[in-house]
Amino acid sequence: MTTDVLLYTTNWCPFCRRAKALLKEKRVRWKELDIEADPAHRQAMAEASGRSSVPQIFINGTLIGGSDELFALDVRGELDKLLGRNPPAT
C-alpha cells in the first residue's frame, strides 16, 4: 500500500523541519510544496486546509494539521496506522 503524504512548508519554518524529521525517521516519502516559492501553493493550501500557517500535512488526502498534530498522532500510535503500517508491539 502506498501512502500519499503531502506537506505545505517554507524553508525557514522550524515546525516544518520537525515534521519532516519525524517522517524521515519513519522512512516515509512525502511531496513537499513550498508556499513561498510558488504563490499557487499558498492558495491551494489555504483552500484545502482553511489555514495559513505551516506546515500543513495531509495523509491520503486527509488534513492532519501541523507538526503538533503529527506528533500527537505518533504518541497515540495512530500515525503508523494512517501510514498503513503495523504499529510496534509493546
Give a label for each model feature.
Residues 49-58, 68:
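Structural micro-motif
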Residues 59-89:
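Non-catalytic, surface beta->alpha helical segment in thiol-disulfide oxidoreductase systems
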Residues 34-52, 78, 82-85:
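Thioredoxin-like thiol-disulfide oxidoreductase module
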